[in-house]
């Protein structure tokens, strides 16, 4: 037992300090495994790469991207960079990041190079509120809550198979989403000088012949959800319809699909070929049919039971769109019987259970279906960015500092999307010589709950460069294991302050 009165013992004890570890090793391990740390280092150097990660860790840990809070937060934590930064210093750092020559090509090309050859990208954009004044990207636009606010646009490309964000671009807040797509993909092609990506996937908001003309003319490989009531889409469905009950058209479950090449008429008279991928789902058909006839039955019941004496003003049933499914009534509601127009009803229900995508390149219906089903990844990524790193608020006064902020958000988003991917994976462990499969940890706890469980983990530094773990619980080790890092809180980290 050491003599606590001994001066050397007292000196040793006074040199001991503990630092908060929490979930930071998970973030760092993900940054290494995804190649993010290497790509940041290649683009901006090791010191700046560590600064970028430390700021991203701050934003993820606190769910706040306020620059002025970093100084009061950074001390006593295991971080890749641990010196404090004033708000002004951080703003200058954001500026320096975007003034690095060719950083976009170097960094994004490095991220793209890590994608598999058959990767599919989802495109989406969002508008972010800002208080910035001297910024050409900031425009006044209508907010989701109504009214007008200053906004800047952010567009993102995210890989389906990897779940990784690979490219982002700012645009003025008042520019419509449709105007950013071709530009985004064109810039992506300019930056990407090696890898041919299978396609970019977009939602129904981008469906129009004008957009398809731009995509084809720019040689952009895209998949877009189709609007079903368009003539050339209906014609494609009619060509495919007899094949959608055949075994060769089966994709999975109750979904069947057929691809139909089409050459719709473009306004400029130029001939362009597109591919309509027509799908049929029995469960979708059943749901839509039940809902349709339930609405008709409810309407007929209201018509039959209508009592003019119990209401004032004109009867709203007389203006209902549902009347198109009936013969012309012989009298008023409550005083006549409705007769269904079966021809109109047949027209309405003919395409129940059908849905379509359109691509600018030939592809099998099955691979288009698989790729479009994965599109919700980008929507989840944006939601995570807004809730976990406050990406819905941009605190910057110039376009260069704003882009620097978005770069940090992009880094945080890369780590978070991989974190969420790991939360969805099953893991194996050996118990008494037998393999046991654990269900995904995301089935049991949220990201914030995982952070809370890891929040107590600390390291002790002895002032001589040596470290030792404070108590790490079995639960904390199991969380790390189920995230794919079984030894994360056993092996001593070789980074951070000592």
Predicted region positions:
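Acidic, metal-coordinating catalytic cores used for nucleic-acid/nucleotide bond scission
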Residues: 176, 201-210, 228-231, 400-402
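Short, surface-exposed basic-aromatic patches at helix termini and helix-loop junctions that form
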Residues: 193, 212-221
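Secondary-structure capping and boundary motifs in well-ordered enzyme cores
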Residues: 49-50, 62, 86, 119, ...
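An anionic, glycine-rich sequence signature occurring as long contiguous blocks
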Residues: 150, 167-170, 220-371, 447-498
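Active-site beta-loop-alpha junctions of metal-dependent nucleic acid enzymes
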Residues: 169-191
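Dynamic "connector" segments at or just before major functional cores
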Residues: 1-134, 155-174, 348, 378, ...
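Conserved nucleotidyltransferase catalytic core and NTase-mimicking acidic/glycine-rich helix/loop elements
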Residues: 412-451
């Amino acid at each position: 037992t050491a003599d606590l009165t001994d001066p050397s013992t007292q000196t040793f004890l006074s040199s001991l300090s503990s630092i908060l570890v929490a979930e930071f090793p998970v973030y760092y391990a993900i940054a290494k495994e995804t190649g993010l740390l290497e790509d940041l280092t290649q683009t901006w150097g090791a010191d700046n790469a560590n600064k970028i990660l430390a700021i991203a860790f701050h934003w993820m840990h606190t769910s706040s991207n306020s620059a002025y809070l970093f100084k009061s937060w950074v001390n006593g934590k295991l971080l890749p960079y641990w010196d404090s930064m004033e708000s002004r210093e951080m703003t200058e750092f954001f500026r320096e990041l975007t003034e690095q020559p060719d950083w976009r090509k170097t960094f994004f090309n490095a991220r793209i190079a890590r994608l598999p050859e058959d990767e599919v990208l989802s495109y989406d954009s969002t508008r972010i509120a800002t208080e910035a004044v001297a910024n050409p990207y900031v425009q006044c636009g209508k907010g989701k809550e109504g009214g007008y606010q200053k906004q800047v646009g952010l567009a993102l490309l995210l890989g389906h198979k990897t779940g990784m964000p690979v490219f982002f671009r700012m645009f003025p807040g008042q520019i419509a989403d449709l105007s950013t797509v071709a530009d985004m993909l064109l810039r992506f092609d300019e930056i990407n000088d090696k890898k041919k990506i299978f396609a970019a996937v977009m939602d129904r908001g981008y469906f129009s012949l004008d957009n398809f003309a731009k995509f084809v003319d720019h040689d952009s490989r895209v998949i877009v959800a189709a609007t079903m009531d368009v003539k050339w889409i209906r014609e494609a469905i009619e060509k495919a319809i007899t094949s959608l009950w055949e075994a060769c058209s089966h994709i999975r479950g109750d979904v069947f699909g057929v691809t139909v090449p089409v050459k719709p008429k473009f306004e400029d008279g130029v001939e362009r070929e597109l591919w309509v991928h027509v799908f049929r789902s029995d469960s979708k058909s059943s749901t839509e049919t039940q809902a349709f006839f339930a609405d008709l039955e409810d309407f007929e019941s209201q018509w039959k039971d209508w009592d003019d004496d119990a209401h004032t003003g004109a009867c709203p049933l007389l203006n209902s769109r549902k009347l198109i499914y009936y013969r012309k009534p012989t009298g008023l509601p409550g005083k006549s019987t409705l007769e269904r127009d079966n021809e109109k009803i047949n027209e309405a229900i003919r395409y129940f259970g059908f849905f379509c995508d359109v691509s600018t390149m030939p592809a099998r219906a099955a691979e288009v279906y698989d790729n479009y089903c994965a599109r919700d990844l980008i929507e989840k990524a944006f939601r995570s960015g807004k809730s976990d790193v406050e990406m819905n608020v941009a605190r910057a006064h110039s376009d260069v500092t704003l882009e620097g902020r978005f770069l940090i958000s992009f880094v945080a988003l890369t780590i978070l999307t991989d974190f969420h991917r790991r939360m969805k994976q099953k893991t194996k462990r050996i118990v008494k010589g037998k393999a046991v499969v654990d269900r995904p940890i995301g089935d049991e706890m949220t990201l914030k709950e995982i952070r809370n469980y890891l929040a107590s983990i600390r390291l002790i530094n002895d002032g001589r460069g040596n470290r030792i773990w404070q108590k790490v619980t079995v639960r904390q080790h199991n969380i790390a294991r189920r995230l794919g890092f079984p030894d994360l809180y056993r092996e001593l980290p070789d980074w951070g302050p000592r």
